């Protein structure tokens, strides 16, 4: 006599027996009917039970496919748990990018490459995800790669997407969740990707290579772009439309940075083959300041944060005011800079130098758009020049502490510059040079601060601000090169 299963209930056992007979019925031929009848008897199934509707068609096959789907779901969930566990470890482990020492705020890579990710083509741009342990890079062949820092195998990307038909020149993430990704290309398009990295929008309008893109710091639905067609464009990515376009330079626009003002809206800093950088007010399209002094193409520009950098440079200028006779002494303490949200910027050029500028504040008139600065003929003041690279300086990044400037060059090196040198020696020199790439350095990225847990509008002191930065800082730094590789530096 057949023993009843100890795992299944009586009803489940009965359903299974019926499903077995149901599955075998169309398989068994006339000659095997005797075997089928004997099996039906052994399983204690009446023939009338199989004629009714108490068991669905193809019951056994459907159960089997359900089990397979559940097994796949379990594997996916186990992988997700593994990734989330690694993310937690990444947040709490020094070896995964977080330094627990008291000097974390001044962390820079020691110079050894922790991981190398190899692509099939020149790496043109790189970005770290704002929140997840993911590295993104765009290549000259139009491919977008996504690498997971927690994976043991660094030879296989998490994902590879044929994003564009020509080179991906730059990419950027929005500043708030959900984190949108924007990529721009020599195929004249900009593409928008959602938080799961699905393509959701293509922006058309530029008439030549799109060089760089940047999300508005104040609105994740607004994107800015610059192009070889000399135009600066403002996009609404939710609608996929261009809201504004204005000519920023007389030649190819190479790069841009954006900052949000408390009362005046956004400002963008752009640079060009015309050897200049320009500050523009987005809402009006008016150019309010120019930065002239480079002797070759200006490849990259960055605003400096209001912490540390401002204090160090202010102190240097104040102590050496005789070197800057055209800077009004009262200007450095003018509260207009607090309202604007910017004061200093840096630019990098093919003349092998980086220049530090004091930005002349635009003229503010109530109920009107900002006008060109009344100071210094709207020209930025050159405060310092960083010399040390032996070839074109292609890319810039600003350390979260605000006082380190990071540069990548065609001389295959990455340099870290300390603004403290202005106070100590009157000049800015490289405190660290790292090398390891075998080709030009095309892009670099220092991990963005994690989202703030505080919702307070309280004005922080410099010390409180630095403590908050240190708490939210991720010690991750990457570079992308013409040698087809991305390096994560430890």
Swiss-Prot record:
InterPro entries: Dynein_regulator_LIS1, G-protein_beta_WD-40_rep, LIS1_N, WD40/YVTN_repeat-like_dom_sf, WD40_repeat_CS, WD40_repeat_dom_sf, WD40_rpt, WD_LIS1/nudF_dynein_reg. Belongs to the WD repeat LIS1/nudF family. It is found in: Cytoplasm, Cytoskeleton; Cytoplasm, Cytoskeleton, Spindle pole. This is Nuclear distribution protein PAC1. Signal peptide: none annotated. Self-associates. Interacts with NDL1 and dynein. Positively regulates the activity of the minus-end directed microtubule motor protein dynein. Plays a central role in positioning the mitotic spindle at the bud neck during cell division. Targets cytoplasmic dynein to microtubule plus ends, thereby promoting dynein-mediated microtubule sliding along the bud cortex and consequently the movement of the mitotic spindle to the bud neck. CDD domains: WD40. WD repeats lie at residues 118-157, 163-204, 205-245, 251-290, 293-327, 328-367, 388-427, 436-487. Its main location: cytoplasm. GO terms for biological process: cell division; establishment of mitotic spindle orientation; microtubule sliding. The gene is PAC1. Keywords: Cell cycle, Cell division, Coiled coil, Cytoplasm, Cytoskeleton, Microtubule, Mitosis, Repeat, Transport, WD repeat. GO terms for molecular function: dynein complex binding. Residues 65-96 form a coiled coil. GO terms for cellular component: cytoplasm; microtubule; microtubule associated complex; spindle pole. It comes from Candida tropicalis (strain ATCC MYA-3404 / T1). PANTHER family: WD REPEAT-CONTAINING PROTEIN POP1 (PTHR44129).
């Amino acid at each position: 006599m057949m023993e009843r299963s100890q795992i299944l209930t009586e009803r489940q056992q009965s359903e299974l027996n019926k499903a077995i007979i149901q599955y075998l019925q169309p398989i068994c031929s006339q000659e095997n009917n005797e075997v089928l009848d004997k099996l039906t008897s052994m399983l204690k199934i009446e023939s009338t039970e199989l004629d009714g509707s108490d068991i669905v068609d193809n019951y056994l096959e459907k159960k089997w496919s359900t089990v397979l789907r559940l097994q796949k779901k379990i594997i996916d969930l186990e992988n997700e748990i593994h990734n989330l566990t690694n993310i937690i470890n990444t947040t709490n482990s020094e070896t995964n990018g977080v330094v627990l020492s008291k000097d974390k705020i001044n962390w820079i890579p020691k110079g050894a490459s922790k991981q190398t990710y190899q692509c099939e083509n020149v790496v043109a741009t790189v970005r770290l995800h704002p929140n997840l342990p993911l590295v993104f890079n765009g290549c000259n062949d139009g491919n977008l790669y996504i690498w997971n820092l927690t994976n043991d195998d660094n030879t296989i990307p998490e994902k590879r997407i044929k994003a564009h038909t020509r080179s991906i020149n730059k990419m950027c993430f929005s500043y708030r969740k959900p984190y949108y990704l924007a990529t721009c290309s020599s195929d004249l398009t900009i593409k928008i990707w959602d938080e799961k990295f699905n393509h959701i929008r293509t922006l058309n309008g530029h008439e030549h290579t799109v060089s760089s893109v940047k999300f508005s710091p104040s609105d994740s639905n607004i994107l800015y772009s610059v192009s070889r067609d000399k135009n600066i464009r403002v996009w609404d990515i939710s609608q996929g439309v261009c809201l504004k376009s204005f000519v920023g330079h007389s030649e190819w626009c190479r790069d841009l940075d954006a900052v949000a003002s408390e009362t005046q809206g956004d400002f963008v800093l752009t640079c060009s083959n015309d050897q200049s950088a320009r500050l523009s007010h987005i809402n009006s399209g008016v150019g309010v300041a120019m930065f002239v002094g480079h002797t070759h193409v200006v490849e990259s520009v960055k605003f400096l944060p209001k912490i540390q950098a401002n204090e160090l440079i202010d102190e240097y200028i104040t102590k050496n005011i005789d070197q800057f006779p055209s800077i009004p002494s009262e200007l450095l303490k003018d509260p207009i800079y607090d309202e604007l949200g910017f004061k200093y910027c840096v630019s990098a050029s093919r003349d092998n130098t980086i220049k530090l500028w004091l930005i002349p504040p635009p003229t503010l008139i109530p109920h009107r758009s900002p006008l060109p600065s009344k100071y210094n003929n709207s020209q930025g003041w050159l405060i310092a020049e960083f010399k040390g690279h032996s070839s074109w300086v292609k890319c810039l990044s600003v350390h979260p502490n605000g006082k380190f400037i990071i540069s990548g060059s065609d001389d295959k090196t990455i340099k870290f510059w300390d603004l403290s040198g202005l106070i100590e020696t009157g000049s800015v020199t490289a405190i660290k040079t790292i090398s390891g790439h075998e080709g030009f350095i095309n892009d670099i990225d220092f991990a963005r601060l994690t989202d703030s847990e505080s919702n307070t509008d309280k004005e922080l002191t410099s010390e409180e601000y630095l403590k908050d930065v240190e708490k939210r800082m991720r010690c991750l730094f990457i570079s992308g090169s013409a040698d087809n590789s991305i390096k994560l530096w430890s």
